[in-house]
């Protein structure tokens, strides 16, 4: 997910996106703990996506 794509979204859509990504991160951590995670690279990728959304949210609120 690119920051340029995120800048086109509204604040409400960005907040919803953060919730979705946090839920996905929780599920990935759970899969990792139970040994079911096939692609471990998705964990840092999801964390970075959350950080990108937070950055764009802060920019829009300023």
Swiss-Prot record:
Pfam families: Ribosomal_L29. Transmembrane segments: none annotated. The keyword Oxidoreductase does not apply. GO terms for cellular component: cytosolic large ribosomal subunit. GO terms for molecular function: structural constituent of ribosome. Belongs to the universal ribosomal protein uL29 family. PANTHER family: 60S RIBOSOMAL PROTEIN L35/50S RIBOSOMAL PROTEIN L29 (PTHR10916), LARGE RIBOSOMAL SUBUNIT PROTEIN UL29C (PTHR10916:SF0). This is Large ribosomal subunit protein uL29. It comes from Syntrophotalea carbinolica (strain DSM 2380 / NBRC 103641 / GraBd1). The gene is rpmC.
